[in-house]
């Protein structure tokens, strides 16, 4: 064919030997077959087999313009012809004439990839059904009972039995084939009873012994070790209002208060702020209907969380931090006493307790003139090693983003309700979710971390130390904490405490889960969000929210009254099953609530955190502040900039909602950027203007300290109620820093710096 083409070309020009162009489409070594190479051959063929030159007669020259035009047309024709011809050769079998003429080697034949069928994607309804099926076949009570056996009871933090249970949890995580299992150890200081007994004694005015009231079996950790003597004054629950309502001053006196309503630490702090010299805490029969009047109980008095001797930094060994002490430690002795001991004290006191206290008829207000009470506390510090145990199911798309599910493991006493139920739920959820991933095709986009904490009884020490140790690693990675502690304390009510970011998720979950006894939906009140209580200091979810800025949720099935045996030696499996006969059903419902949280948070492309909920929180704060607009104006201040910051936050949430609506849900890069903006919201409500060491709970809504919005309002109220106590300089700082914190949250939600509304 090439010879024929050459012959035609030569004849056209009268046989004159001219240059011609060869196009080689040979496949290159690097696999690029689109390269075109041009070569010029003059006077002779590349394959001149006969080695003869063509003898031609020199023709007459044609007109220049006609010749050049004709040449151009023919060249283009030949180019098209050769490209088409060689293109056709690619479609024939290897080693054909076409391939040899093109001068190419046969391409390496690639083995076809085996076509495995893709696992079908599981949707929300599928996953909800699979979770329900697994819950139906799970026996929670046997695990709770196992954790209450002698080998694990009692399991005070740092004890051998606490470690035994830690190793059991670790082995279980490994048996469940989680993606990874590891442990985290800390060296912390706790307070324990000394060999010298604590005591409560009645003495006369000269300090002589009248009689011993009690050598209590329980104690209050982190009490000051001291002996004090003074009159005894009853202050109901020890709230601020209770102290305000008292007719008798408490300065220089020992205060006796009822357990409940607020934490031990808050009771002690309130008493100490009014110069009380000691505190006694008892459980009255009205609120805690326990038959055994001699029952002792345990608690702690640290107004904070974590190791109080390493405030704001982790308790790792050999960290060489200078000696430090939390400002939340009390400077007065504190002791729990039995109801029987309290009644003995009331026998030496005068004045009936107010009827609106709704307490025991034996209650009295103050000791008689001739008698005092002597309190001796001899607790000592002890350094212990604690273990936190972790297991993770890694996400398939965003493994670096994770929800943390945790439960306290230790307990003073048997701890069936306090830590046994939570640990059992943790183990069963880890087993079920691992099974769903390994066998049922569940592919969570984000990771799930299961955490078993130690030293929870001493103020969420294990959880807080982990947060302090890994705060920078957790930032914008851990996006929710689900607390399983004390999830089953009754059957009558379902109560929840959480960050507003989780309210929408909670509402949807309540609509999906049925009450374990009545069979009705947990969602019974459309106004439920207004009744949500703040997370308290004794809740392990609190440091996640207030210290780390991680949205957190804690929930329970419970009664209107407190569970009476928490922190006592009667917190046993036997008492738990007697009070809650349908324990397995209630535990199943608690696991279903937590399980649905976990699925929605790790499965959906859009993060299930409702950032718009904070608009109503900010609006509520501004409304409260507006009541004092005249006072603010008198100080020469304006709320204009606060309004502007609040408006910027509202606009930022609206823009983000629009961005989510316009985003292509299958574009993971875009969705991740949007989700990252959502994850910043809670964190940026941590005040950047206070030290984590001095004020660890920096959240302006849910933390504690002068930087909080509630503290700002409390200070401002004093301008009318008690002007001498009002601190105007403090208020000016509070208002300015609160405004900038809100503005910072709005800026973070806006995204990139060029998207921020800079009119502020």
Curated annotation (Swiss-Prot):
GO terms for cellular component: external side of plasma membrane; melanosome. Residues 223-313 form the PA domain. Residues 87-760 are extracellular. A motif (Cell attachment site) lies at residues 646-648. It comes from Pongo abelii (Sumatran orangutan). A lipid is attached at residues 62, 67 (S-palmitoyl cysteine). PANTHER family: N-ACETYLATED-ALPHA-LINKED ACIDIC DIPEPTIDASE (PTHR10404), TRANSFERRIN RECEPTOR PROTEIN 1 (PTHR10404:SF26). Residues 1-65 are cytoplasmic. Belongs to the peptidase M28 family. M28B subfamily. The keyword Magnesium does not apply. A motif (Endocytosis signal) lies at residues 20-23. Stearoylated by ZDHHC6 which inhibits TFRC-mediated activation of the JNK pathway and promotes mitochondrial fragmentation. Stearoylation does not affect iron uptake. InterPro entries: PA_dom_sf, PA_domain, Peptidase_M28, Peptidase_M28B, TFR-like_dimer_dom, TFR-like_dimer_dom_sf, TfR1/2_PA. Homodimer; disulfide-linked. Binds one transferrin or HFE molecule per subunit. Interacts with SH3BP4. Interacts with STEAP3; facilitates TFRC endocytosis in erythroid precursor cells. SUPFAM superfamilies: PA domain, Transferrin receptor-like dimerisation domain, Zn-dependent exopeptidases. It is a single-pass type II membrane protein. Coiled coil: none annotated. The chain crosses the membrane at residues 66-86. This is Transferrin receptor protein 1. Residues 569-760 are annotated as: Ligand-binding. Residues 1-67 are annotated as: Mediates interaction with SH3BP4. Cellular uptake of iron occurs via receptor-mediated endocytosis of ligand-occupied transferrin receptor into specialized endosomes. Endosomal acidification leads to iron release. The apotransferrin-receptor complex is then recycled to the cell surface with a return to neutral pH and the concomitant loss of affinity of apotransferrin for its receptor. Transferrin receptor is necessary for development of erythrocytes and the nervous system. Positively regulates T and B cell proliferation through iron uptake.
């Amino acid at each position: 064919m090439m010879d024929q083409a050459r012959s035609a070309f030569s004849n056209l020009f009268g046989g004159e030997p001219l240059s011609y162009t060869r196009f080689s489409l040979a496949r290159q070594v690097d696999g690029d077959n689109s390269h075109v190479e041009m070569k010029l051959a003059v006077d002779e063929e590349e394959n001149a087999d006969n080695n003869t030159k063509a003898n031609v007669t020199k023709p007459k020259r044609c007109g220049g313009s006609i010749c050049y035009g004709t040449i151009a047309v023919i060249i283009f024709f030949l180019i098209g012809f050769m490209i088409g011809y060689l293109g056709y050769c690619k479609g024939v079998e290897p080693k054909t004439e076409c391939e040899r003429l093109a001068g190419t080697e046969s391409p390496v034949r690639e083995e076809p990839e085996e076509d495995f069928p893709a696992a079908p994607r599981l949707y929300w309804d599928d996953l909800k059904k699979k979770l329900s099926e697994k819950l139906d076949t799970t026996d929670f009570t046997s695990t709770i009972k196992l954790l209450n056996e002698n080998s694990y009871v009692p399991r005070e933090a740092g004890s051998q039995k606490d470690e035994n249970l830690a190793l059991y949890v670790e082995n279980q995580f490994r048996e469940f084939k989680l993606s990874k299992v590891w442990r985290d150890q800390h060296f912390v200081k706790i307070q324990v009873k000394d060999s010298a007994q604590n005591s409560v004694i009645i003495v006369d005015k000269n300090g002589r012994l009248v009689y011993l009231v009690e050598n209590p079996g329980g104690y209050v950790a982190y009490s000051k070790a001291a002996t004090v003597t003074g009159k005894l004054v009853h202050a109901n629950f020890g709230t601020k209002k209770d102290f305000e309502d008292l007719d008798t001053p408490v300065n220089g006196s020992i205060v006796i208060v009822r357990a409940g309503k607020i934490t031990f630490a808050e009771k002690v702090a309130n008493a100490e702020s009014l110069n009380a010299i000691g505190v006694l805490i008892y459980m009255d029969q009205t609120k805690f209907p326990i038959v055994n009047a001699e029952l002792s109980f345990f608690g702690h008095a640290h107004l904070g969380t974590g190791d109080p001797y390493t405030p704001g930094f982790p308790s790792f060994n050999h960290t060489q931090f200078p000696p430090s002490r939390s400002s939340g430690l009390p400077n007065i002795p504190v002791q729990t006493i039995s109801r029987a001991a309290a009644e003995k004290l009331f026998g030496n006191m005068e004045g009936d307790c107010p009827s609106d206290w709704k307490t025991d008829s034996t209650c009295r207000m103050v000791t008689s003139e001739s008698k005092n009470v002597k309190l001796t506390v001899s607790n000592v510090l002890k350094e212990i090693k604690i273990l936190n145990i972790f297991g993770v199911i890694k996400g398939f798309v965003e493994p670096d983003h994770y929800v943390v599910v945790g439960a306290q493991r230790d307990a003073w006493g048997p701890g069936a309700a306090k830590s046994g139920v939570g640990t059992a739920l943790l183990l069963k959820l880890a087993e079920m979710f691992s099974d769903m991933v390994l066998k049922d095709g569940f592919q969570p986009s984000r990771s799930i971390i299961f955490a078993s904490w130690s030293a929870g009884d001493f103020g969420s020490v294990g959880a807080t130390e982990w947060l302090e140790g890994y705060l920078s690693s957790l930032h914008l990675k851990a996006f929710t904490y689900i607390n399983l502690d004390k999830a089953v304390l009754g059957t009558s009510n379902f109560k929840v405490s959480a960050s507003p970011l989780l309210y929408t998720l909670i509402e949807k979950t309540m609509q999906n889960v049925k009450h374990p006894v009545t069979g009705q939906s947990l969602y019974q009140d459309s106004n439920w969000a207004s009744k949500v209580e703040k997370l308290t200091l004794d809740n392990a979810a609190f440091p996640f929210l207030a210290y780390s800025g991680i949205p957190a949720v804690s929930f329970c099935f419970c009664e209107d009254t407190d569970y009476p045996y928490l922190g006592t030696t009667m917190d046993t499996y036997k008492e738990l099953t007697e009070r809650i006969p349908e324990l397995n059903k209630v535990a199943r419902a608690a696991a279903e609530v937590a399980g649905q949280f976990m699925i929605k948070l790790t499965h959906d492309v859009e993060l299930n955190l409702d950032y718009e909920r904070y608009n109503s929180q900010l609006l509520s704060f501004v409304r409260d502040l507006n009541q004092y607009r005249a006072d603010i104006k008198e100080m020469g201040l304006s709320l204009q900039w606060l309004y502007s910051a609040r408006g910027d936050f509202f606009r930022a949430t609206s823009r983000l909602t629009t961005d989510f609506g316009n985003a292509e849900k299958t574009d993971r890069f875009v969705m991740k950027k949007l989700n990252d903006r959502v994850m910043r919201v809670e964190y940026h409500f941590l005040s950047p203007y206070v030290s984590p060491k001095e004020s660890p709970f920096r959240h302006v809504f849910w933390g504690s300290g002068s930087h909080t919005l509630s503290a700002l309002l409390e200070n401002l109220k004093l301008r009318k109620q008690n002007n001498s106590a009002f601190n105007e300089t403090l208020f000016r700082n509070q208002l300015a820093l609160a405004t900038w914190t809100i503005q910072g949250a709005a800026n973070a939600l806006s995204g990139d710096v060029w998207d921020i509304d800079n009119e502020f």
